[in-house]
């Protein structure tokens, strides 16, 4: 199940809220313009291509494109591999998103498989949204956040963009992300 955990931004040891209730998650996040919803899962091949993922969710993807005006959509597929380069690739992919940053674009992600955590630093709180298969999270442009896919990333996520440049982050040079439980720690605590 999806999990929302909230802490003061100065004290990762004090959990103010921890919930798996979808309605409570929706209500808390919508205060900040963040939307959370769920889609019915579809069958996918073991190692799907971006095209196979998008085709499986064509109706939902088209509806989001129509509603939000996105012009580019793709699917990120991360899965453990026997390739000797996999550990280095996984580490590099994870580290790319682990620091606080913002985007000039909304960040909409649907998890078709696996999980990841979006940490939203809003006001004086950190909201860790552990998204799992079936979750669609929409984070408004310019929201300070970071993302952790874990030390062994294993997910399929559909990504939506308003321009052809795709993902462009403006990093904030803070150490806030280092002070909060990681994806692996949140998963282990369940």
UniProtKB/Swiss-Prot annotation:
Q: Which Gene3D superfamilies match?
A: Jelly Rolls
One GO molecular function term of this record is: nickel cation binding
> Under which name does UniProt file this protein?
Acireductone dioxygenase
Site (Important to generate the dianion) residue list:
109
- Provide the site residues for: May play a role in transmitting local conformational changes: 106
Entries under CDD domains matching the protein: cupin_ARD
- Residues the record annotates as the site (May play a role in metal incorporation in vivo) are 100
Keywords, A to Z?
Answer: Amino-acid biosynthesis, Dioxygenase, Iron, Metal-binding, Methionine biosynthesis, Nickel, Oxidoreductase
Q: Where does Ni(2+) bind?
A: 101, 103, 107, 145
This protein's species is Saccharopolyspora erythraea (strain ATCC 11635 / DSM 40517 / JCM 4748 / NBRC 13426 / NCIMB 8594 / NRRL 2338)
Instruction: Name the family the entry cites.
Output: Belongs to the acireductone dioxygenase (ARD) family.
UniProt key word Iron = yes
How is the subunit organization of this protein annotated in UniProt? Monomer.
Domain of life, per UniProt, equals Bacteria
Its UniProt pathway annotation is: Amino-acid biosynthesis; L-methionine biosynthesis via salvage pathway; L-methionine from S-methyl-5-thio-alpha-D-ribose 1-phosphate: step 5/6
Give the residues the record marks as binding Fe(2+). 101, 103, 107, 145
This protein's cofactor list reads:
Fe(2+); Ni(2+)
Q: What is its EC number?
A: 1.13.11.54, 1.13.11.53
Pfam families listed in its UniProt record: ARD (PF03079)
